[in-house]
Each structure stands twice: as structure tokens, then as C-alpha cells.
Amino acid sequence: MKKLSTRIFCLFVFLLLSFETFSHNGSIKGFVYNGEGRKPLEGASIYLKEIKVSAVTDGFGSFFLKEIKEGKFKIVISHVGFETIEEVIKIEDGVTTDFVVHMFPAPVKINEVTINAKKELTLGSVSGIDLKSRPVNSSQDLLRLVPGMFISQHQGGGKAEQMFLRGFDVDHGTDVSLSVDGMPVNMVSHAHGQGYADAHFIISESVDKLDYGKGPYMMDKGNFATAGWVEYKTKNVLENSFVKAEAGMFGYVRTVAGVNLMDKTVGKSNQEAYVMGEYNYTNSYFDAPQNFNRFNVLGKYTNYLSENKILSLSLSGFSSGWDASGQIPQRAVDAGLISRFGKIDDETGKTSRYNANLQYYQKLNTHSYFKSNFYLSKYDFELFSNFTFYLEDTVNGDQIKQKDDRITTGYNASYTSNYSIGNLPVKSELGTGFRYDDTKGSELSHTKGMKTVLDRLAYGDIRETNLFAYLNQSFFLTPQLVFNAGTRYDYFIHNYHNFLDADPQFVANKAGRFSPKAGLYYNYSDHARFYVNYGMGFHSNDTRIVAFQNSNSILPAANSVDVGAVFKPYSKLLLSSAVWMLDLKQEFVYVGDAAVVEPSGRSRRMGFDISARYDVFKWLYLDADFNYTDARARDEAAGGNFIPLAAKITSIGGATFKFNKYFSTGLRFRHIGDRPANEDNTVIAKGYTVYDLVANYSRKSYEFGMQIQNLTNTQWNEAQFDTETRLRNEPAPVSEICFTPGTPFFIKFAAAYKF
């Protein structure tokens, strides 16, 4: 046994340290640039048709293909939003051929999407198209670009969105990992709930690229990446300075501006810098003015230190304040006490976040590169709300205050190397990093008014550290077949200083978890890819709870399998589908409004996803996503094993009409079916279908737009929960649906000037 272990260890070391074996074939060293200058274009797909060999450009716009037999080949370069290029390249024995190409922007076309490149590009291309073709004006719109993702807002825009994905009520982020340029959005051990992910500091016009994934299959995604993950990349280059203004019903105003700090004539220099700012205000459609306001700012500087080194620094932040009408019980509306847009008890809140993120990317040689980022965030949050009214305190009411004040810092680093073992191409990625959160005075209190604390339910300092490392190996068994395997290890250190103890002191606990993952990807042809993924993941639990528990219950595992395919039946149609299953060992649900943890036992979710993107004609583009999930608790008897708010059927889609190169309109819909609001399905959260209409007229220097939300003025509930409440003077509590009404008919107009 000892000899076997030694051999396995030696093989492992060999896989990491093996270098490319020399061959007598030729190779291609290429660069792809954006436009006339020498700004690299990342994510362009390279494909040699005759021999079915592919690559994708890195952050330097470079790619390297080796072991190419001698001869002439047709090389195809494509990228969403750019004109596809086809050229003939000659490969000579023992010679590295230099290849440089400049790509120019063009209308978005399905035929630019390739399924011959690496799997990440293929699976993220659908949202890449959507990012180019759909109007995006808020972080809500950005999240809706993820196929199957549903969101709801129940604080007028102030709180993080409630998310639904693959049968998960993700709440504000328990099972979806969000990040921007390598910086996490989710907040661990947050006062309002574990994984709280407020993405409102993102200015939508700054987003250059969106990647996403469903399931716990990515090695570099750790905590919260069980149902899925979303990663945004901001622009390095602002092509045009611009000013944009929007105005609409209910006192809605939005202004955003971006200024390129580098003169356009410096397009061939090695530096880029821009600043962007945004302001939002609305009273919203509720009976009581919501007084929502938010200010965002972003500054980013990028220096191409050399052909092989990129350094980027971004500073961003936002500050927001609001009033809210809160969730209201259906019986109050039915009795005529309030309207659908009324209130029982006023709510209010404020929050801010300021970030610094330093990114470094170095290409070590044609076969390997190193990338890293260091981030620092200052965050605060204060929320007054009342979900149960007079259930617990019939005199003062049940208003609670939640407060969070923290500093978060972290570092991510990875080294990637491409080499060969004999004639077998191999790609290795080794990553490591840490995250540290220091929260001062995390608070949940029963309050009266804005200043009187009646009772503190949770109050203390939190320190949480996450150390991690991962190894990811890809073996290119044939040009069409890739096997990927690896593992990730996460180690958590939880410290809680409970001020409510008679003798306050730090209580600590530690836990670690391995998360192995594997996948097999097969390109059947130029137009079809099949894949199988297996992965383990986890979501950590609140430090205030796990500090007093054994390590077995801190990081419950998630096990998941996906079997899927991506098809292009012909050049204008892109289809993707997947059948999947995900098991959770235990669903710890932190109820931030009550300061308790509700372990709901093991669960299983099974379902399928279907997405379609279709360029029907030059003037008509169709897109649709359909998602089905069956979610059940495994330790409960049939009939009482429903998972509250787990959506069974969701669908999003639309049609875009391009009348000419300047004018376009779009009609969109989103649908979510009825879903259980409690464990025995006796209370139903009603589904809805809502239609939106958009129109846009764009020229080189200016742009006009119109958007109508809820075109048919459908009555729908954006957020809804089965909640036990008691109104003033009610003799007994009542458990029923409490909801936040969805947007009624709403129209807004926009104008932009580019310079």
C-alpha cells in the first residue's frame, strides 16, 4: 500500500512538472487586437477547420497552437460583437508562424459563437450575446442575463435582490456566488443573512463581459457556488466618453456619465483610464414615497507594462438610502385596510460600499501565465423593518434593526501552464488565496422608532477567515475530447465575540472541506458538443452559529451532476440543454429577521434547462430560456417534503426587431409558475407572466431609448412569503402570504450623447 501511495504521489508531481515534449511539426503564435490599435481582444475563438484544432485568446489577445502538421489550413477567428475573419495560413515543419489580426465591431450574430473552443467560452456565450443585444440599466438587469435566473426586490431597490436558480430560493445569495473582477460580492455572516450579495455598486455601463455557470463545477469558485455563480468583468477601455439621462413615471430619474481620461490619439499607447458616475432617484409606485436614492462611482486605470504584463487598478463605491412600504399581508388588502401598494409599518435603510481592486496579469511564456488580484472593501448596512407587525410585542410592535459594519480583504492567485506528456496536451492550473472579514458590532435588535433599543437579539464582533487552494488538470485526449479533473480545499476559521454574554469573549471554531470535481467534454462535430460534469461544493454558515457547533455541521456538502449539450443545427441557431441533479447534505437556512438557524435536513433537486438563440432574419432575433426543477426534502414524508419558494417552472424570452442599423425594438417576457410557500404545499406563492417593451434609436454620437415595464399592467407579486403576522388589535396571529407588489405599468425615456 505504501509503494502504491508513493507511485501515485510521484505521478502527481510528474503531472505538475512535466514540460512540453519537442516535436517536428509547426506551430502558430498569434495576436488578436481590437480595431486598428494594439489593444488586446480577450476571448476570441481560433479554429483550424481542417484539423479541428481550437484555442481562445487570453488577456493579452494572444494564443499559441503547437504540433500542427505541415500544410495550408483555413483559420477562423470569431468573437461575439465582431466581424468574423477567415484566412489561409501556411504551416512549415519546425517553424513557428507569427499571425496578427485586427477585429472590428459588427452587429451581434449567432454565427460568431463557436463551440470549438474551451468549455467556459461555449457555456458563457449565450449571456455574451444577451449582454450585447438586451438593454441593461441596472444590476437587476445584469442578473437577469443568466439563463434561468429569477430575481425579486422587496425594498424598493435598496436591499440585495432575492434570487431564484435551479430550485433554490437563494434569498440574497446563500447559494449563488457573485464576483466582479475577482472581487467577491457575497458577504459572509451578514446581519441580514448569510451570503448577502448586494451588487448595486456595479454600474451596468461599465460591464464588458459576463461569465456564469450552474452547479459547483468550477475549481476557482468556492463558497456559495452551489446552485451557480456569476462573474462580471469591467471594461479596461472606454471606447467613448458619454452622458446619459433617463426619466420616467413615479419620479424616476437616472443619470450616468463616463469620461475617458486618455486622449483618443493615445489609442496606441500602453495606458487606459476612465471614470464613471451614476445617480438614481425614485419615489416608486407605492402609496408612500420611497425616497430611494443611490450614487455610484468607478475609476479604473490599466497599464500594459509590456507585451506580457498588465496592471489594473479600480476604485469603486456606492451609497444608498431609502424608505420602504415593506411586505404586506393579503388579508389587509382584502379587508380594504390598505391598497396593494400600501403599508402597515414604515421601513427604512441605508448602505454603502467602497472598493479597491488591484489586478496583475503576466504571460510567462507562450505556454504559461500568472494572474492575481488583491482587494479591499469597506462596507456598512443599516435596516429597520417589521415583518410580523404585532406578533411578539402587541404594544410596541416587532420592528427590528439590522446593522453590519465590516472591512473585507482578500487575495486570489493562479498559475496556468500548457504542456505535453508525450503527445498528450495537458493544461494545469494551480490556485490559492484567502479572504478575511472583520465585522464590528453586527447587530439584530428589537427597536421602537429609530433610536430606542428594546432588546438585543444578536450583538457582537465577527472575524471570519477563508483560506483555499485548488488544482485543476485538463487532458486533451483528442482534438475533440477533453477530460478535466481536480480538487479544491477550503479552510475556515470562525471567531465570534458575543457582547450579550455575561462574560464576553471570543468563541472560535475551525473547519475544512475538500471539493473534488471532474468533467468530460466531447465535440461531436463543428456544431455539437456533449458534456458530463460532476462536482462537490458547499456554502458556509453564519459564524454566530457555527462558533458553538462541531465542525461537521459548518460546511455541509453539495453533490451535483450535469449532462448536457450545445448545438448549432445551422449557423443562425444556437441551442443548449442540460439535465441535472443536486443533493445537499443539509440545508442550513439562516433567518436573519429572527436570528435563528433552521436546519431543514437533506434535500434533492432535479431538473432540466433549455436555451435557444435564433437569428431568424437580419431584422429578427429570438431568444428563450425554459427551466424545470423538482425540489424535495429527503428526510420528510411525502406531502410534507416541499421546499418553500422553490420554483418549478421559469421561463424568460423575447423578440428583437432590427428595422435598420439605427432603430430596434424588443418585446420581452418573464414567467414563473406557482410554487409552494410552505412545506406541505397548502399555501401557494402565485406565479406570473410579465411583458416589457423596449425601443432604441442609436447613431454614432447620440442615442434615444424608451422602455415600458409591465406592458399589460399585470397584477403580480414580486416577493412573497408565508409569514405569521398579527395586525394591531387582532386577537390572534394569522399565517398567510405577505407580499411586495410588482411594478405596475411603467414607462421611462432615455437619451445619451457620446463624444
Stretches found by the model and what they are:
Residues 424-429, 433-435, 460-584, 627-630, ...:
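Structural signature of Gram-negative outer-membrane beta-barrels, strongest in the C-terminal barrel
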Residues 304-318, 349-499, 523, 569, ...:
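Face-selective signature of the C-terminal outer-membrane beta-barrel domain
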Residues 415, 580-583, 599-679, 750-754:
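Gram-negative outer-membrane beta-barrel transporters
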Residues 66, 184-214, 232-233, 299, ...:
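Short acidic/polar hinge/loop motifs at secondary-structure boundaries
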Residues 622, 674-678, 697-755:
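C-terminal beta-signal and adjacent terminal beta-strands/loops
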Residues 27, 247-281, 286-325, 348-365, ...:
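Transmembrane beta-barrel wall of Gram-negative outer-membrane proteins
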Residues 359-361, 369-387, 523, 529-537, ...:
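Membrane-embedded beta-barrel scaffold of Gram-negative outer-membrane proteins
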Residues 211-219, 227-263, 285, 554, ...:
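Short strand-turn segments of transmembrane beta-barrel domains in outer membranes
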